[in-house]
Structures are given as C-alpha cells and as structure tokens.
Amino acid sequence: MKENYCLQAALVCLGMLCHSHAFAPERRGHLRPSFHGHHEKGKEGQVLQRSKRGWVWNQFFVIEEYTGPDPVLVGRLHSDIDSGDGNIKYILSGEGAGTIFVIDDKSGNIHATKTLDREERAQYTLMAQAVDRDTNRPLEPPSEFIVKVQDINDNPPEFLHETYHANVPERSNVGTSVIQVTASDADDPTYGNSAKLVYSILEGQPYFSVEAQTGIIRTALPNMDREAKEEYHVVIQAKDMGGHMGGLSGTTKVTITLTDVNDNPPKFPQSVYQMSVSEAAVPGEEVGRVKAKDPDIGENGLVTYNIVDGDGMESFEITTDYETQEGVIKLKKPVDFETKRAYSLKVEAANVHIDPKFISNGPFKDTVTVKISVEDADEPPMFLAPSYIHEVQENAAAGTVVGRVHAKDPDAANSPIRYSIDRHTDLDRFFTINPEDGFIKTTKPLDREETAWLNITVFAAEIHNRHQEAKVPVAIRVLDVNDNAPKFAAPYEGFICESDQTKPLSNQPIVTISADDKDDTANGPRFIFSLPPEIIHNPNFTVRDNRDNTAGVYARRGGFSRQKQDLYLLPIVISDGGIPPMSSTNTLTIKVCGCDVNGALLSCNAEAYILNAGLSTGALIAILACIVILLVIVVLFVTLRRQKKEPLIVFEEEDVRENIITYDDEGGGEEDTEAFDIATLQNPDGINGFIPRKDIKPEYQYMPRPGLRPAPNSVDVDDFINTRIQEADNDPTAPPYDSIQIYGYEGRGSVAGSLSSLESATTDSDLDYDYLQNWGPRFKKLADLYGSKDTFDDDS
C-alpha cells in the first residue's frame, strides 16, 4: 500500500506540472488570442487588424483515486478579454458540472470535489462559457472540452472462476495441455502496464507448468500414474505490471484429475485355489469364485474368465460376474465321488479392453490353478435303465411275471434296496412287485381291448434311509390274444323285390357286408364269411366271400311274395384269421318289398301281416266302424263340456278356495282334516289358469301368468302343487293368497295343539296389527282383517 500511495503522489505532481505547462502560453504571450477581421488605419497611418477573441485552455487530466484533503485542481479557463477586473463570469456546464467539477467564476479555476474512478467512468465532457457578470450576456460562444480520468494501477487481476477442474490421462507426455486459465484486469490496458498480466504457478510443481502469457497449464513430468496419485491441486497466479515488483496479483485453484488408462494387467492374489463340491450337486450349482485384481477402473478394469486347461473342463464351467468382477465356477455335469474324487482347472483372467499404446506393458492376463475335490454324499439308488418296457399277454393268470426292474446303491456302503409301486399310477392295482428283487407280477387278468398299454412308476429306496429313493417309469404292453370273435360292422338290412319270376331279377348283391374284430390285426382280418353248415344249401340266398374282408349276399331264386313271407332271417358265420380262429354267427334281416318296373323300392309295409291273419273284409269294416263311433262319442263329450257355462265340478261360493281343510267332525285337530279336496285339484280350469278368490274382492286387475307347461290330460296332484308353488315364487307382483283354516274348536285342551299360523284365539289379544298396512299388497288382506278390529267392535 505504501508503494501505491507514493505512486499516486508522483502522478499528482506530474499532473500539476502538466497543467502549469498548459497555461504557460498566456504568460509567454504566444497563445494569446488574435483577432481576425477588417483593417483600420491608425493615427500614424498604421494599419490595425481586428482579431477574434478566443479561449486560452487545453485538454485536462485528473488522477483517479486521489485522496488528498483539498479538491484537486483540474485546470484553469481564461479568456483574452478578461482584464482581471472581475467583470467576466465563467460558467461550467455538462457531465458532472456542479457536482463533481466546480469552477471559480472569477478566476476560471476548475476543481474536482470527489474521488474519481476510471473503471467507473473514463472521461467527462464539459461546456465552458464566459459571460458578462452584470448582464449575463455571452462574451464568447461556448466551447466543449474533455476531462480525462488518468488511470493508476488500483485493480488486481481477477480470474473468471475461483476454482477450475480439469482432467488429463495418466502417463501423458510432457507438455500435454491440461487447461487454460484466464484472468482480467479492470485497469486501462492502453496506459502503462497496469493491465499487462503474467501467469505463474505457485503450487503444483514439478508435475505441472503454466505458460506465462497464455495461462495454459501443461504436464511437466512423464508417466504420471493414476494408481499412485489420482488428484493434484495447482495454484496459478496472475500479476499485472508485467509481473514486475509493485504489480497487483490474483490467484485461482485448479484441481487436476488423472483419468485412467489400461496400463495394468489383472493379477490373481494367490497361485492356487482350493474348492470342493458334493457329488449330490446338480448342474448349474455354484462351486466357488476366483477374482483377479486390476487397479484400473471402468472398462479398463473389466476382466473376463475362462478355463484354458485341466481335467475338469468337461465337468465344470466358469462365468464372469461383471458386478463383482469375479469368476464363478459352476458344475457343468454331475460328478461321482466313487468314480473321480478330484479335479484340476487352469483359469485365465484377461482384460476385456486393451489400449494398443500400452501393449508393451502386457500381457494383460494372468492364470491360476483351481483344485476341486469331490465330497461323498448319500445318493439315492440308481436304476440300471432310465426306463423299462415289459410285455404280458392278456388274460394271463394272476401272478404271471411281467418283468423285473433293478437298482443299486451307488455309494460305497451299497445299502440294500426295497422296491414299491406308485399306486397313483396303478389305481386298479393290476400289478404287484417283489420288494426285494423287483419282479413285477399281475394281480388279475388283463384285457388288451380295454387298455393296450399300462404305465406305472416303480420306486427304489434304501432300506436304511427311506428318504433316499429313486423312481423309474415302466411301460407294460398287453399282448393280444384272439379272444374276440368278429361281428357285423353295422346293423345290416337287406331288401328284395317281390316278383312272379322264378329267377333272380339281378346279379347284384342284395347287400354287401363287412366285419369288425376288437382283437389286434394279427388276430383279426382276414375275415371269412359263410353260411352255417346246416343251411349251406339255402334255397333262397347264398353268401359269396369277396376275399377283401367283405362279402355279398345274393338271391338264389325269384318269385318272392310279401303275402307268403315278407321277412327272412339269414344266419351268416364270420371267422377271423387268428390262431386258433374265432367265429360268430350274425343274423341278416332281408325284407320283401314292392318295387316298380325298374326295381326301385316302393313300400315295405305290414299288409302281409294283416292279410295273413285270416280276417275277412267284413270283420275289418266292423272294426273300423267301432273306432269311428268311439271317436264321435269323445268329440261330443268334449264339445258339451266346453259349451256349459259352469264347470263340471261346482263348488259353493264359500268353498271355492285353494287347500281348504274340512273337518268331518269338530274338535280333534289337524290330524282329522282332509288335506286336499281332490275335486278341486282335478278341476282342469285351475291347472294352469288363474282361479279368482270369490271371498276376496281384488284390489287391482290381475293379469294371469301363463303356465309353465301345458295342462296334461290327467292331473297329477304332485305336479300341480309344485307348479303352483313355482309360479308363486317367481311372481313378485302376485297378491297374497292366504290359506285361512277355520276350526269349530281350536283345541285348547288338545294335546297336539294347533299347527295353524292363524289362531282364532289371538283375535282377543291386545296386539297392534296396524303395522301390517305398511307391508305391501301381499299383507293387505291381513291388515284389513286385523287392523280394523276396533271398528268392527264399535259397530257391534
């Protein structure tokens, strides 16, 4: 700060000297105004020249940041017409006039009353004018002049950012550009060296350097290793005055991070890994993990693992866990303790991404030996085959041996084995198995035609550890035995035309027949068709075997007549090709029918039966007449019944009700009642229609619902009741249809008591039945009967 004050004082003195020099012409007289005008003659014949009067002044300067006790003298204004008698008044106007700059109106001296800052305002433009003090008449036209604020070095350099962050790859060459920092100085760059900056590094050597003029930071050491040190803190200084003494300075911090390159290979921390796996492990199960360390990061540190050698390459595999960068060794296929107890693997770890610039640092991989021991486990029994197929003939006697399954204990203990059948696969219990030797036998005869294949599951378990068990599928084929005779493939029926000719009308077969056999094809076709031996010479029909498992039935003669015989039953023997063969006799029905001249069937009705019955024409007419008379009687009965105004069954008005119980003798109870009036139930008008209550006046017009089904010819009581119940349940708009039972004696002394829901004794109680009015139309009648009790009492 001392240096700054001394510099300011020197600049002030320099400015004063400049100002004094500026006004020197007035004293010396060579800057006095001269008058330029017309010429006049003096007394002695001299020619006088009139000159224009003007200002005597120059451009003014003022030092910024002046802190003296008195106002700074900026300069002095003077006109050549000023004789010093005080008649001229100087006026100052313009920027800062009267506030920053003041003028002595007599002497013309200008002073700065405030401290000026060039960085806020570099110059001020003012107007000067001389006027007559008494009249304020301008003596000279106004003139403009400038007051410049002269700069001093009062602003230190400032960086654009307080801190910088930069990255540079590790192992970069010397001189690699890292980042450029820039500072600025608010001082005047055109005046002196106040704004001339020079950069230097204060912290960060010897790793980095900075260019003095540009501020570019560069690496200063080769092969900087990120794994040794990743982050550096550098301090950069910017100093004005060209870096000379007395200049002001500013600093900034730069954090430089070394980015990673793949300059390190993966490395296993140990040379041998020991692992173990149980022989009971399943493929895909993890055995263990290995990890090679790579100090690089990101993609440069990615490692992949492979098995490159060893006797366990077929039994084990390795995958890479990219989250943990570990090699996961898994079981590829089952291992057996009794077969091989140890394996050796050579595992390689290699970088995924390799930088060619650092290939000389390689190889970027490492290998390790992994030894895996197999641990013994209590294994379940093993069947000698993955599945079994056995055969047995159908109809074989119970206890017939079907086959055998065999399993053994793979462990060294060789525990005894016990066999059993999964009964979920043999629900009918067709088979049994010897638990000790595994022989499978039948328990009942089998039928191939029902099931040709039977599939069961057999379990084998260790006798000392039932939890150790194995299972195997066993397929049993039921072999066919010729135990089914062939039969007609369809219910065949033949037709033959009646005629007067004695020879057959056609050489075509009456019908072509074929057969089916439930047995296997070996015991089925070829089928042989023939007539039974006893009718081999049938005079009417014959059978010709077509030798293709079909046969044709032919007529041996003509002249068939329906009057003589309209139906023939022809037995046909069918034999199969089994050993021994099976045969059956099937009956073919052949009808004699009427045909046209072309042989087309016209009718095969039952006239022959009527004619052959021996009835005369008169008898037939009598039978038909009786039938007609009976039909006429029935029609008349129905017609008369419909024309009657009243139904056939008449009820008294008070008896027209549904399910009215009538006592033959009073007293007793409901056990003495007749439950139903069968006549009412038999009334056909009440089956599906609506029967109105004659003792109840309907509140609204009721639209009868159609019956659920048409009325039968004869009424069934049970169906009638169920139908009515279903209609009532499904009709929410139906009015209440109460069944009120009236008893002459309520039976207070009866042991059985009353089963009726409406007891007349309750009419004398004090119950309030007005709430029935709110229960809707179904309870309207009850509300009228019980809710108006008081009214009836009053009337009586």
Curated annotation (Swiss-Prot):
Residues 54-159, 160-268, 269-383, 384-486, 487-612 form the Cadherin domain. Interacts with PCDH8. Changing residue 260 to N: In TBHS2; results in decreased cell adhesion as shown by a cell-substrate adhesion assay. It comes from Homo sapiens (Human). The gene is CDH11. Pfam families: CADH_Y-type_LIR (PF01049), Cadherin (PF00028). Residues 1-22 form the signal peptide. Residues 23-53 form a propeptide. Keywords: Calcium, Cell adhesion, Cell membrane, Chromosomal rearrangement, Cleavage on pair of basic residues, Deafness, Disease variant, Glycoprotein, Intellectual disability, Membrane, Metal-binding, Phosphoprotein, Repeat, Signal, Transmembrane, Transmembrane helix. One of its GO terms (cellular component) is extracellular region. The modification Phosphothreonine is found at residue 791. The chain crosses the membrane at residues 618-640. GO terms for biological process: adherens junction organization; aortic valve formation; calcium-dependent cell-cell adhesion via plasma membrane cell adhesion molecules; cell adhesion; cell migration; cell morphogenesis; cell-cell adhesion mediated by cadherin; cell-cell junction assembly. InterPro entries: Cadherin, Cadherin-like_dom, Cadherin-like_sf, Cadherin_CS, Cadherin_Y-type_LIR, Catenin-bd_sf. Residues 54-617 are extracellular. This is Cadherin-11. It is found in: Cell membrane. Expressed mainly in brain but also found in other tissues. Expressed in neuroblasts. In the embryo from 67 to 72 days of gestation, detected at high levels in facial mesenchyme including the central palatal mesenchyme, dental mesenchyme, the eye and optic muscle, and the tongue (at protein level). Glycans are attached at residues 455, 540. Its main location: membrane. GO terms for molecular function: beta-catenin binding; cadherin binding; calcium ion binding. It is a single-pass type I membrane protein. It is linked to A chromosomal aberration involving CDH11 is a common genetic feature of aneurysmal bone cyst, a benign osseous neoplasm. Translocation t(16;17)(q22;p13) with USP6. The translocation generates a fusion gene in which the strong CDH11 promoter is fused to the entire USP6 coding sequence, resulting in USP6 transcriptional up-regulation. Residues 641-796 are cytoplasmic.
